[in-house]
Amino acid sequence: MGSAFRRSLAPVLLFVVVCLTALNLRSGIASVAPVLGQIQDFFGISSGQAGLLTALPGLCFAAMGLAAVPLARRVGLSRTLAGGTLALVVGLGLRPWVSSFSLFVALTLCVVAGIALANVLLPAWIKQHGSGRTLVALMTTYTTMLGVSSALGPLSAVTQKSWQGALWIWCLPAIAQLVAWIVVLPQAGRDVAHGTVDGAGAQRPMFTSPTAVAMLFFFGLQSTMAYVQMGWLPRMLVEKGVGENTASVALAVIGVFNIAGGVVMPWLISRLDRLTPVPIVLALCTCAGWGGVLVAADAAPLAWASLMGIGGMCFPLALALLTARTRSALTTARLSGFVQPGGYILAGLVPLSVGVVRGATGDWTAVLIGLMVLSLCMLVVGLRATTHVYIDDELAA
């Protein structure tokens, strides 16, 4: 990404920025699912159009993910992340109060565009400004706060009286995030990511790395599970006889397990050479969770959510691998810019397909069987993605 321009930031400031940014990476999306039916009634939209709302995050993440690295090359990591935060604040602040569905979609795009830039660039920003134990601690903070965001997002539907309030409330932490970036910008300077891979290795496309390709599909399949859960799980449970509040709590339970995964996974990766059992256990838990919803959703909805939550630890695992399997901020940014957009294309298409299949079949059977199959596919690619190799070395070979 060009020549490095790097300034040292105070550790406290690093942690504050990472905490606030990660806190806003899921709440603006996860808060939609519990009130999706109310939004559908308010705008008078079809199930297919509602499915579009659940697909937007993945598709926009893919598009903005492709733009994130070139944009950061031009203006720097911190400036790009600050600009994305501004878009997030505008979208979250205005989205609940519009009367046009088209405008609602446009403002949702602002929300997910801001989140998308942070999804791709925050790991590279952490790699750029952190080192040693601080780097591991920052990645732990990042993945943990992602779980907090996922857990808290659905609960706004329980605490707020209207769907508008449930969505708008998340503008407040986004404003705090914007203030933090305003403080960081003068100190960070034009922090273009630096790298260590030279020559052909620096120019070779990421798809020439088998591990990077496996990470793309692993990330994509786990993101698929996450966005189907955030977009459709509460509705699945409600239509199978579970109360609305319980359905919202079930989604929050998944987020609680993501918090645990955020704490555990960076630590686990930094200490274990062999991670093979991890994707096996997590993928099988995901499969079992979907199976429980299929055969007995109302019998133990929180148990099925807990299994999905354990399986959801694949997400912090995939994120932690971005820095653990690269040697430089440059390669981290390139890997993140390859893995996340490609993964989010898959994660965007599947939730959209869920709405279409549900509308065509009239129930959730085909959808849930398909999700169980995808869980097993995640197991297969996860075995390759967790191999202990460095992407830099594969590119230079």
What kind of region is each of these model predictions?
Residues 64-76, 261-274:
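Helix-to-loop junctions at the C-terminal end of transmembrane segments
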Residues 107-144:
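Cytoplasmic helix-loop-helix junction between adjacent transmembrane helices
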Residues 33, 210-262:
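Extracytoplasmic gate region of multi-pass secondary transporters
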Residues 103, 132-133, 140-186:
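Helix-loop-helix hairpin linking two adjacent transmembrane segments in secondary transporters
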Residues 326-365, 371:
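A late C-terminal transmembrane helix in Major Facilitator Superfamily
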Residues 63-101:
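Conserved MFS/SLC helix-loop-helix module at the cytosolic interface between two early adjacent transmembrane helices
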Residues 44, 76, 97-102, 273, ...:
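Helix-breaking motifs and short loop linkers at transmembrane-helix boundaries and internal kinks
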Residues 273-318:
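C-terminal transmembrane helical hairpin of 12-TM major facilitator-type secondary transporters
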